[in-house]
């Protein structure tokens, strides 16, 4: 309340404009409803991780008092899928709206931090910073073109190591290929354990499919709960030797698929930096491309071929645009056989060499 009063004071430095003053208090009130009586100065990184998860589930226009659809509906009803909202189908907010929401919360917490220097509060703000940066990064990238993929993954180029000359480090060989054929984020791939490479039986048959299990077990962290998923392994990855590579590591009693992947502040910046250098030497200099472009290649391929939305979401870990569909899908078990059919249909027209230790 003190913060809102401060920002509503006319003529004060940093005060809200008339339009902003109609929006920001409602966003802050939704934020306050999540934590109840807990003081803002006591908020921690874990609290912010929880709120970020919730921020992606808040319905579009939920905080707008003129939106009559939500009269009598509380955030708790939405998050628990209460009977009161069964008859309401509405969309979740886009990434840009979530980013603006998080920026509003960050400004508030920075204001609190100036008045109460709490170390835990700074870690909470850091969590918001990271998520805002991730949204900016992902939304500003495009997919690689077919020619760019060929340059990066098939042809010789000026990089000292490539798919023609060979790689001395397995993570540099596998990271781009796994991203292209699974749509997984760089952190999701770098943190994989050997136990995440597993065979899963299809519900509709007794056929087992090799899968990559994206989960948050142990020291692993995911962007959202929707990120948990099992992705069948494309035959091109199997032919390139991914299963053999994993088996060799198991024989050496390793635990991680990429033991050399280094995490810092929940990011794998070293691997991202390596790819930036590699792609630059390969001649891909467009700033709208980055490692995340592989994820766009994957989802674009599926969407351009009219793959059903539920299968695209099951493979990519994206959020449904509809809350009702999201809740329904989260409570059903996905048939890995159907997912394998989608993965096996992917053909970028590329030839890949086999990994050699």
Language-model segments: what does each one mean?
Residues 96, 174-177, 181, 270, ...:
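C-terminal catalytic core of tyrosine-transesterase DNA break-rejoin enzymes
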Residues 27-30, 38-46, 61-127:
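N-terminal DNA-binding recognition helix of tyrosine site-specific recombinases/integrases
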Residues 110-124, 171, 179-208, 309-314:
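Short, charged phosphate-coordinating catalytic segments
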Residues 82-103, 123-186, 190:
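Basic, Lys/Arg- and aromatic-enriched nucleic-acid-binding interface segment
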Residues 130, 191-240:
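Conserved tyrosine-mediated DNA breakage-rejoining catalytic core shared by Y-recombinases
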Residues 1-27, 36-40:
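Short, aromatic/basic-rich helix-turn unit that serves as a nucleic-acid recognition element
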Residues 108, 149, 156, 217-218, ...:
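Active-site/catalytic core of tyrosine-dependent DNA strand-transfer enzymes
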Residues 143, 316-355:
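Catalytic-site neighborhood detector that most strongly recognizes the C-terminal catalytic loop/helix
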């Amino acid at each position: 309340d003190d913060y809102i009063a401060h920002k509503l004071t006319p003529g004060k430095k940093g005060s809200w404009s008339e339009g902003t003053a109609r929006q920001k208090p409602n966003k802050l009130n939704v934020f306050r409803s999540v934590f109840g009586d807990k003081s803002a100065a006591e908020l921690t990184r874990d609290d912010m991780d929880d709120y970020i998860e919730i921020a992606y589930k808040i319905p579009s226009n939920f905080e707008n008092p003129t939106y009559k659809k939500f009269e009598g509906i509380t955030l708790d009803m939405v998050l628990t899928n209460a009977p009161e909202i069964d008859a309401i189908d509405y969309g979740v907010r886009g990434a840009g709206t979530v980013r603006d929401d998080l920026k509003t919360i960050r400004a508030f917490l920075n204001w609190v931090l100036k008045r109460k220097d709490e170390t835990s509060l700074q870690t909470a703000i850091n969590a918001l910073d990271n998520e805002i940066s991730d949204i900016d990064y992902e939304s500003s990238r495009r997919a690689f073109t077919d020619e760019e993929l060929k340059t990066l993954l098939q042809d010789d180029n000026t990089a000292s190591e490539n798919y023609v000359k060979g790689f001395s480090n397995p993570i540099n060989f596998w990271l781009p290929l796994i991203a292209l054929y699974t749509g997984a984020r760089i952190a999701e791939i770098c943190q994989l354990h050997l136990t995440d490479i597993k065979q899963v039986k299809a519900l509709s048959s007794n056929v087992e499919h090799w899968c990559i299990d994206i989960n948050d077990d142990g020291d692993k962290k995911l962007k959202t709960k929707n990120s948990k998923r099992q992705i069948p392994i494309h035959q091109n990855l199997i032919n390139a030797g991914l299963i053999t590579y994993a088996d060799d590591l198991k024989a050496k009693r390793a635990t991680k698929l990429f033991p050399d992947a280094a995490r810092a502040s929940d990011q794998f910046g070293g691997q991202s930096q390596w790819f930036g250098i590699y792609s630059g030497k390969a001649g891909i200099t467009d700033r709208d491309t980055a490692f995340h472009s592989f994820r766009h290649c994957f989802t674009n391929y599926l969407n351009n071929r009219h793959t059903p939305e539920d299968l695209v979401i099951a493979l990519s870990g994206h959020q449904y645009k509809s809350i009702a569909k999201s809740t329904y899908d989260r409570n059903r078990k996905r048939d890995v056989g159907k997912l394998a059919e989608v993965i096996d249909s992917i053909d970028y027209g590329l030839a890949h060499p086999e990994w050699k230790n």
